[in-house]
Amino acid sequence: MITYSLLHMIDTLHTEEDCRVYLENMRWNGKPICPHCGSISEHHYKLTKDGKFEGLYKCKDCRCRFTVRQGTMFEGSNLPLKKWFYAIYLFLSHKRGISSCQLARDINVTQKTAWFMLHRIRYNVKDDDANFNDMTQVDETYIGGKTKRNKGGQGRSTKQKTPVMGLLSDGLVYAKVIKNARSKVLLGVIDELVRKDSTVISDSWSGYNKVKNEYIHEVVEHSLGIYVNKDGFHTNSIEDFWSQLKRGIIGIYYLV
């Protein structure tokens, strides 16, 4: 897999023209596609301004004008593509997240603009059609609110926290806010996303007891101090995701 450093990105995508050409190559591969009628052609008209082409096309079939930004997160934004590309890079490279205040400082925009950019980026990287096959780790956690100790100092209350369920397979994570962590709710999420002949790996929480009725169920007995079961299965990856998520929240938000 090819990876790029920020310095490589700065050198390669140095100007707005560089960024536009890069985006056109990634989206169209040399054949611009009209977003209005779907016409694919190397011969759409290139419209110039003061003798210079700046990425505005006119469809040879429906005669509508378009740019490579249309149909992307960049549509309707007057920000240079270079700032968008840098924002995407910073968003993806900060595994614990990046705040709108920090992004604003990094790319020299207002906090309001950075907030808008981050929301567009998050919306475009989400995957609502995730499907999990083969081996899937599942776990639930509680996020947000203030942690309060119960009377007598025993345990911690989760009444002010929001339950979230997570599924992980082959590096893909799906997290969903759930009503509660009872069996009916947990199984509903699993049934929605996981293929029936798959292996589901969980801890020994009773909410997963019925998983074995529909899936190959591997249990890791955390309550016994076991974190890898006798067959080598674990839930370490999804738990690491929770850890990164919570650290990101602590580092960016005052309260969730």
Predicted region positions:
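Residue-level recognition of single "structural anchor" positions
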Residues: M1-V256
